[in-house]
């Protein structure tokens, strides 16, 4: 895996350097008019806007909403770290999200002591990278040192209540006689949830299987893949399923897809380039640092 990882990082580097030379700005209506006109009458948000001023207001509002969901996703990951993390405390992990709240609806004692443990870890001069990530995030949000523990506890309560709400909706949908209603519920359940940076390994296997089938059918010729775009590579902080945090912060998907392409003979190491696109600036910063380290001869 290391060989392919180094190759991947080297391939990322040119794309990162190009991005650093561009100017980030909002698109004007004139620049997107031809595209959104294709969706007139479709109900797609923003597709009915024809005025430059209205478009500018709408796209800025969308940007604020997305950034708010990114922050909420980080807050969700922090709650998972509190529930299951072992890198900052020796306290036993909680069995599940439900154990975070007592019957009264307040944060349970077992959860409170873990909240306190993380708050204490935040004061350490040289904490682990996840704790440092949390501290920097709270600082950016303007959370004062003396208010950290209260914020973490309130956020954990909010997170747990949301998880219970999702489960309740799924259970109610499961009782419906219409299978389409169940699918609709599952498909829209997380439409407003925070955008977490954590990923799953499973899509990587599915992608490799798909590439293998396409190659077998002749849809992709050997050695023809030269550029790969990974939308939402993510950053494994503490996963939603088990909350493991014993490994360094890492992004796997860019390396997994490139390794699959090389292993299947669909691309050549010397001619493969990968570009990553993510809404979360922390993910983009991580990938940029990976590329910088690679140029300095450091493996990932």
Give the residues covered by each predicted segment.
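Conserved alpha-helix/loop element of class I SAM-dependent methyltransferases that forms part
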Residues: 201-225, 256
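Class I SAM-dependent transferase core
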Residues: 183-198
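Class I SAM-dependent methyltransferase core
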Residues: 228-230
């Amino acid at each position: 895996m290391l060989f392919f990882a180094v190759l991947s990082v080297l391939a990322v580097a040119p794309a990162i350097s190009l991005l650093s030379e561009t100017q980030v700005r909002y698109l004007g209506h004139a620049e997107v008019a031809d595209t959104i006109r294709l969706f007139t009458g479709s109900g797609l948000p923003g597709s009915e806007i024809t005025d430059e001023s209205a478009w500018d207001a709408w796209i800025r509002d969308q940007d604020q909403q997305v950034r708010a969901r990114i922050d909420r996703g980080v807050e969700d990951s922090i709650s998972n770290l509190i529930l299951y993390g072992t890198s900052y405390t020796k306290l036993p992990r909680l069995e599940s999200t439900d154990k975070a709240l007592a019957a009264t609806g307040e944060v349970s004692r077992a959860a409170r002591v873990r909240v306190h443990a993380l708050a204490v870890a935040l004061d350490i001069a040289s904490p682990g990278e996840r704790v440092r990530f949390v501290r920097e995030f709270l600082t950016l949000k303007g959370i004062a040192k003396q208010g950290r523990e209260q914020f973490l506890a309130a956020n954990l309560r909010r997170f747990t209540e949301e998880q219970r709400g999702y489960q309740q909706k799924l259970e109610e949908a499961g009782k419906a006689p219409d299978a389409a209603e169940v699918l609709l519920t599952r498909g829209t359940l997380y439409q407003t949830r925070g955008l977490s940076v954590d990923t799953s390994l499973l899509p990587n296997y599915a992608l490799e299987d798909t590439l293998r089938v396409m190659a077998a059918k002749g849809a992709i010729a050997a050695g023809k893949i030269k550029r790969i775009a990974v939308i939402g590579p993510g950053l494994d902080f503490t996963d939603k399923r088990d909350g493991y945090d014993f490994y360094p912060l890492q992004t796997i998907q860019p390396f997994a897809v490139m390794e699959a392409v090389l292993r299947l003979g669909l691309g050549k190491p010397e001619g493969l380039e990968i570009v990553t696109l993510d809404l979360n600036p922390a993910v983009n910063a991580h990938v940029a640092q990976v590329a910088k380290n690679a140029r300095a001869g450091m493996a990932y």
